Structure formats: C-alpha cells, structure tokens
C-alpha cells in the first residue's frame, strides 16, 4: 500500500487509480475545492503526506497549482497527456493502470526555491524550444523525467523546482533519442 494519500479530481479517477495501486484517495471534486475536501486533504497531508495526481489538462494544472500553494511539501505525479487521452477527453480515468503506476513511481517534490540548474539555453541546445516539434519533445522528455508537460517557460520552471539533476536531464535526453529519433 502506498503510504501517502493520493489526491485526484473525481470519482472516475479514484476508480482508475485503485485498478493500478493499493492506496487511499481523495477526490477534489473539481477546482471549487469545498472546505470539507480541503480539511480532508489537510488531515491526510499532516498525517501521511499526499501525492497530487491531477489530469494533464488546463483545469488539472490549475488544481495542482492551487493545492501546491496550500500543501507545499506535497509530492507530485504526472501521467502524460498522450497516455491519459481518448478522442475527446483527457483525464486520469483514461490512463491505463500501467501509466498510473509509472507516474507514481516517479513522484517528485516541488521545491519552493529554484535550483537555477537549468536555463533557457539548455532548452534551445536540446531542441526543446525554437525547433520543429519542440512541443512534442518537451512532452516526451517531461514524461521520462516524471514532471509533466509545459510550455518552454513552464518546463524550465519544473526542471528547476522539481530538483532535476544534470545526470537525470542527460539520461532523459538520451532515452528520448533512443526511443524517438531513430524511427
């Protein structure tokens, strides 16, 4: 059983995560976050810790951001959008149990202080911005690192605030090259 309580958006997400792992879960019920839900999350955070696993879409990122402010030592897990999408829907409920397990294997803490390890130049030099398919490459490298997707500025912030090391960065770029560039 996972020690921390996993925070997701809805009941369908709870059902999907339960297919993947043995864990206690709390659903936010969307962005509105009722006070009773916040109290439940706070109790879990203080007693066992929480893992935020929201949908890889705009509303999910807003919920994650809001929870990150309230619970700064929460852990974060990201299922890539490509693994949580159907034709017309994006959400954890669409992810395979294996995708959920992979995301939970790569949980990260969001450090309030930036490491300043990475700079926009690193993204340029790695073709993660300003290049053909930079968007797709950022999504793939973000999935490998377990930090999710973001535009170039958001991605750079995640690299620095999730404590990614140069070794992890180089390993992720190499893995990307092995998987995608030799097709």
Task: Please report, for each region that a protein language model flagged, where it lies by residue.
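Phosphate- and divalent-cation-binding pockets in alpha/beta enzyme and binding domains
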Residues: 16, 62-66
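Hydrophobic anchor at the start of a short beta-strand
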Residues: 24-25, 50, 74-75
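Acidic beta-strand-to-loop metal/phosphate-binding motif
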Residues: 7-9, 47-59, 78
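Short, basic, helix/turn surface patches
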Residues: 50-62, 102-110
